[in-house]
Amino acid sequence: MNEVSIRTLNQETSKVLARVKRGEEINLTERGKVIARIIPASAGPLDSLISTGSVQPARVHGPAPRPTIPMRGGLDSGTLLERMRAEERY
């Protein structure tokens, strides 16, 4: 972690905040003593998992697709539709 004096922070605020944006943690000092810390804001725990590569962000927007449930009787949808259509005709 790097240290920045309050005086430097007042004079170069945008530069210090740019460093924080890049992920750097800054210790603020007053007369050589650390009095505060500026750390990058995190949107949540998911961001850290994405940055480490543990998870990947979704590629499709919207709700997640529901898992398919096997039909009773072992029929596929095509066979079931054929039977339903045949029953409607008579």
Swiss-Prot record:
It comes from the Bacteria. Keywords: Toxin-antitoxin system. Signal peptide: none annotated. GO terms for molecular function: toxin sequestering activity. Residues 53-90 are annotated as: Disordered. InterPro entries: phD-YefM_TA_antitoxins (IPR051416), YefM-like_sf (IPR036165). One of its GO terms (biological process) is positive regulation of growth. Belongs to the phD/YefM antitoxin family. Antitoxin component of a type II toxin-antitoxin (TA) system. Upon expression in M.smegmatis neutralizes the effect of cognate toxin VapC35. This is Antitoxin VapB35. It comes from Mycobacterium tuberculosis (strain ATCC 25618 / H37Rv).
